[in-house]
Amino acid sequence: MCNIPAFGEKTCIQNQENRHNRVFHIADADDRSFDDYCALFEGVAYVKKEEYRTPIHRFAALSKGKQGVFINYYSFIRELRIVIEDFCRYFSYVDTCKNLSVSPQITQIMLEDFGMSYAIRLSDGRFVVIDGGYNFEPDRDRLFCCLKNESPESKPIIAAWIMSHPHIDHYQCFIGFVDRYADEVLIEKVMLNFPEADDLEHYPDLSYKDARFTDDVSEITNIPRMLERIKRTGAQSYTLHTGQRYRIGDADCEVLSCMDDTIHVSKNINATSLVIRMCLGGQTILWTTDAGFSYARLPERYGSYLKADILQVPHHGFQCGEASSEIRGYDLIKPQVCLLPVSDYSAYTFFCSYREGTRYLMNAANVKEIITGSTQRTITLPYTADDHVRREMKEKCARGERDNGARTWVYTGLSTSCKEDFSFTLLNMTALPATVDIELFFEAKECAIRFIKAEIPASSLRTLCIIGEEADGDALFFNGDSLKRKGIPEDVPFAVRFLCDKPMVVSHRHHAASYASMTF
């Protein structure tokens, strides 16, 4: 075993991912560092089995006995990553492709609200399943029906079941699916890279228990249950590491990110998510699952190599990590078609369209279609969106905002002599908190009061006095028109304007709004 760091590096972080995987993160590396570590392992009898490079990324895979070593170097960020896996199966990976008999296709399984379940039919009639969704009877039944209906064989063959990360809405379907349908399908391989079930040091949320469920859905309980089901199927299990390339039927798959790359920077389970670049049917599909682009530094590590025809929108469009990094990624990916694993309601009315990164994607000129999960949808590869669907997407965005209220509300005919005229009710029906700017106008211009701010929590109804303690009347560092500086004139008429960063419903017990406007 080599001692790492071996060449006097000042910054080296070591993490134990689970019982069989260790990862070393070396900063301020260069091309020579990559070559030196390859030579170091080769010098102690490791055999280099694979090596490739792109303009800003180098990868090498070495083996010795049952141990595998995977080395990645990213020149733009000057980071070297070394992963050592005991009992490694990567080098014995074999996939036997059958006769090409059908067109490849992707089915986004119907979702109750959100989750992730994809069935990818290969050209030989076998399937790649990504995640599967919740361990709910409808989720597993819809997945099985899709496999059964689209398979050219009487018994569907799952060439690979890929599990992206340990969250209830992604992998737990596998447990119930095996319990119900193990005898009616053949599962050849399972692919994943999960932490240990009790790794609360790195991932405290593994013990999270959701009060909405009567069953124990915590990962501490369900990761072992999932592993037991894998053994029950007899499927070969592979631990995926960044840089590895797999040929599954006629699908070429490359792992761009996994827990290897984020264990040292985030305790967020979503950050461990697999990112897989798949080439199938003459197109490139980027599966980002729930990855946070900023945690994984995907734009910096891969640049234009991220370009894809079809993008599965990360984290259901809910955003994970910084929006700015997501937007940089979308500018590099430039997808024409997006798969968004949420219902129309969550996508356009309740959540996604109000996230900065997802809103940017919805307005990107290159995006011709966003396919949500309200209905089950199958696309045959290569797939090109119809010309009219972009217009329909824009109409859904606009309708979603209208359904939530307006961005600007104006009330007139109020009087400072009436205490109740300062009391308003605000309804925020989105899943994100809203900021409201409030302005008061009087007949005398110099009395105007500006930049009163109020925060309205997500999915909530709030009644507030706009000049009371529940509103911030002096929100700016310097506000010459602040409530505190000017005060309220006595016994004069006034008007109030609400400017909302989310669509909002503003009401008053005794007055109707004089004006409300929607901006989109």
List each model region and its residues.
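Active-site environment of divalent metal-dependent phosphoester hydrolases
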Residues: 114, 136-137, 166-172, 197-200, ...
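Core dinuclear metal-dependent hydrolase active-site scaffold
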Residues: 88-156, 231-307, 377-397
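Gly/Pro-rich, tryptophan- and cysteine-flecked surface segments typical
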Residues: 396-520
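Binuclear metal-ion centers of metallo-dependent hydrolases, dominated by the metallo-beta-lactamase
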Residues: 95, 184, 189-191, 197-254, ...
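Active-site metal-binding motif and surrounding structural segment of the metallo-beta-lactamase
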Residues: 125-128, 137-195, 301-318, 334-338
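Amphipathic alpha-helical segments
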Residues: 28-50
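Compositionally biased P/S/T/G-rich terminal and signal peptide-adjacent segments
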Residues: 1-24
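Ser/Thr-rich, low-complexity intrinsically disordered terminal regions
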Residues: 47-68
